[in-house]
Regions:
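Extracellular beta-strand-rich, repetitive "passenger/adhesive" scaffolds
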Residues: 143-145, 304, 326-335, 351-357, ...
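Secretory targeting and sorting signals
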Residues: 2-10, 15-17, 23-77
Length: 706
């Protein structure tokens, strides 16, 4: 346990702190006036007198936002500590994902593994159900008076609770309390909400559970018809296609608790929520706030850490001052109301840590300049939270956490919550590094590299509950090149894919962990769609683990693969595509799919795809589903628990006497199988037609060590 800190300004009475901050803000007016008048000399080697003044006051102003946290103090160890609730990663035994996914500071514990008086829901992977959107596809349902209790696996002073509440009858959500106790005492209350959950209907979705179909002229699988063209008109049950059911909330516990201490989450009697579903608990040791002493402290420029007044202009003033004096901007602990974009260029902004510094509001975002205006360079954002207020999907709205064009920039250790997209970059731009961020509860994507993003890295990010692709590269009109997604974790995207690559050159997707995609997508996706430029150079998909993917595609009424290649706009045949060292675990349908769409089935092909050193642990149907013309090679692809024929080869659905239009090349070492024998049997090669659109689905066993 680290030593307790000496008493800081945070320990003073609130009135004394308020007086100190008032003095600081008053002095800041003088500092800003001097800076504007040009009376502060610029020095490269050392800060100016005004900058030193700001630095000296930074520490004294630090305490305001930390008042609620209290000092860290561990309780004495229990004489007989309880066995800890199992720690998982994406609801997996961590050994099955070792070396893959984001390296995070928290321990994940699933509610279904905890002690509870509630009811287990799931397992179920059927879209539009509460279990389907839960991590591991199970959760615990509580009614008032019931609880779920977790035993801490390690010291912790902070928790994150992932939960679901009912919607209001007419939409818009409700709020309800959740009591948190540690070792049966120290009760705190969280106010949960479903105001950011519950979308319905067809794209781009609605918040109204009683809304009629948004697109009655679209074919829907529920009636296997186009409702507007069907007589008699089908009766469509309401609410239609409920989704995006979960949210999460964080809580500082006020002190450090030890491994073996118990965290109990109780729905109090009289709760307005008929039920509360708890999916999981993340626990961690946050520690003390970060202090940036030699910085332009935003408090000194009028920023309000209580969140009552808008701080956007004050932050702009701090940025302008910092750029003139070659200083970073520091956002001390607190909540800062910002209801527009903060435009950043050539500036470093750091907070006290994402648990202590929050920038919150309608339309809040940190944006680089538009690429057409030259874009921004040298932007460095770190150690704060961005809390948006986005409740509906409007694709033209620029309400993303981070946006614009930012070359030679870094985005590190942010927590981005309730924005439309966590980070959406519109290039051309180059050399941005996005690392160690937590991106949750987004209406659309977690991150998107859109249009001409090059030489950039996304690493060690944790993404959960997005409403579209978790991480995406979209090479629309101008190609992306030499970008890498490495060691990220993506869990429970409610629509589309965990990681999606739409065109581009020399791309790497490596050592990621992707779990529980829900519908109209899967874990890993390579697609020539949405007007993307062709794949060229190389595409390397290496050392990733997926679990509980290979989802049902409701528009096609078939199952996808954990990794799926989709040729729609053009061929996928110019790049050298290497899919190497991946593990596809507990696949609902297939492990691998290569597919086109019916209107273009005789116009497009997929070629130059090579699968090597792959492990497939359980498929509901096949290892490979081929529904396109082309070819692929396979080497050392080992499979077990295969639920149907190993290769479901439909080709382009012309069924010529010469065999399928898709061929599989055997490079040796393809072992294992399942219900029909060896998955890569000689009789299937190179292009035997084995097409079965809807074979019986055999639920695979839980993944286990190979």
């Amino acid at each position: 346990m680290p030593p307790r800190r000496a008493a800081s300004p945070a320990a003073r009475a609130p009135e004394a702190v308020a007086e100190a901050v008032a003095e600081v803000v008053a002095d800041a007016e003088v500092v800003v006036a001097v800076a504007v008048a040009g009376g502060v000399a610029r020095r490269r080697a050392a800060p100016t007198r005004a900058a030193a003044f700001l630095a000296a006051l930074t520490v004294s102003a630090l305490g305001l936002g930390a008042l609620g946290a209290g000092p860290a103090a561990a309780r004495p160890a229990a004489s007989d500590p309880a066995a800890p609730t199992a720690v998982t990663r994406a609801a997996l035994d961590p050994a099955l994902a070792e070396g893959r996914g984001a390296r995070v500071d928290f321990a994940e514990q699933e509610a279904e593994n905890a002690v509870t008086t509630g009811t287990l829901i799931g397992p179920d992977r059927t879209a539009y159900s509460l279990p389907a959107e839960a991590s591991g596809r199970k959760a615990v349902r509580l009614v008032p008076g019931q609880y779920v209790e977790f035993t801490l696996p390690a010291a912790a002073d902070a928790i994150t609770v992932r939960y679901s509440l009912p919607d209001a009858p007419a939409g818009g959500g409700i709020t309800a309390p959740l009591d948190v106790t540690v070792n049966g005492k120290n009760r705190r209350s969280m106010t949960l909400t479903s105001q950011y959950s519950w979308l319905y209907n067809q794209y781009p979705f609605s918040n109204d559970p009683q809304a009629d179909l948004l697109h009655p002229d679209w074919w829907i699988t529920e009636c296997a018809c186009v409702p507007a063209a069907t007589t008699p008109a089908p009766v469509i049950a309401k609410p239609f296609r409920p989704t995006h059911m979960y949210d999460e909330q964080r809580l500082l516990l006020g002190r450090t608790y030890r491994a073996g201490d118990t965290i109990r989450l109780t729905v109090p009697a009289g709760s307005p929520a008929a039920w509360t579903v708890i999916d999981l608990l993340d626990s961690q040791r946050v520690g003390a706030p970060h202090v940036e002493a030699a910085a332009a402290n935003a408090l000194l420029f009028g920023a309000d850490p209580t969140g009552r007044r808008d701080s956007a202009d004050a932050i702009d003033r701090a940025i302008a001052f910092a750029k003139r004096h070659r200083l970073p901007v520091y956002l001390p602990p607190g909540t800062y109301q910002v209801n527009r974009h903060i435009i950043v260029d050539g500036v470093t902004i750091t907070g006290a840590g994402s648990w202590y510094t929050t920038v919150k509001g309608k339309g809040v975002g940190f944006y680089g300049k538009e690429a057409a205006d030259g874009g921004s360079r040298g932007v460095h954002l770190s150690r704060f939270a961005i809390e948006g207020d986005v409740r509906e999907r409007v694709d033209t709205d620029q309400v993303n956490g981070v946006g614009g064009a930012m070359s030679d920039s870094t985005i590190d250790s942010l927590h981005i919550h309730h924005t439309k997209v966590g980070l959406w970059f519109d290039g051309p731009m180059s050399n941005v590094k996005v690392t160690r961020n937590v991106i949750t509860d987004q209406i659309a994507d977690g991150l998107n590299f859109h249009t001409g993003v090059t030489d950039s890295l996304v690493q060690d990010n944790f993404v959960r509950n997005t409403g579209d692709d978790g991480l995406a590269m979209w090479a629309e009109k101008t190609t992306n090149a030499r970008n890498t997604f490495d060691h990220n974790t993506v869990q429970s995207p409610t629509l589309a894919n965990g990681i999606a690559i739409y065109g581009g050159a020399d791309t790497t997707v490596s050592a990621n962990l992707v779990a529980d995609p829900v519908r109209e997508g899967s874990a890993l996706h390579v697609g020539s769609r949405f007007g993307a430029e062709p794949f060229t150079g190389s595409l390397r998909v290496e050392g990733n683990t997926t679990v509980r993917s290979g989802t049902y595609e409701l528009n096609w009424n078939i199952g996808l693969g954990a990794i799926w290649f989709y040729a729609l706009d053009r061929n996928i045949d110019q790049a050298d595509i290497q899919v190497t060292g991946n593990s596809f675990l507990d696949n609902t349908y297939n492990a691998i799919m290569l597919v086109s769409d019916w209107p273009v089935k005789d116009k497009v092909r997929i070629e130059n795809v090579h699968f090597k050193d792959i492990r497939v642990d359980g498929t509901g149907t096949s290892v490979v589903s081929a529904r396109v013309a082309g070819s692929a090679s396979f080497e050392n692809v080992d499979a077990r628990g295969v639920g149907a024929v190993g290769v479901n080869n439909c080709g382009s659905f012309n069924f010529p006497a010469t065999g399928s239009e898709f061929s599989l090349a055997d490079r040796g070492g393809n072992d294992g199988g399942g219900t029909t024998g060896p998955w890569f049997a000689g009789w299937e090669l190179p292009n035997t037609i084995t097409c079965d659109d809807r074979p019986p689905v055999v639920a695979p066993p839980a993944p286990s060590p190979w």
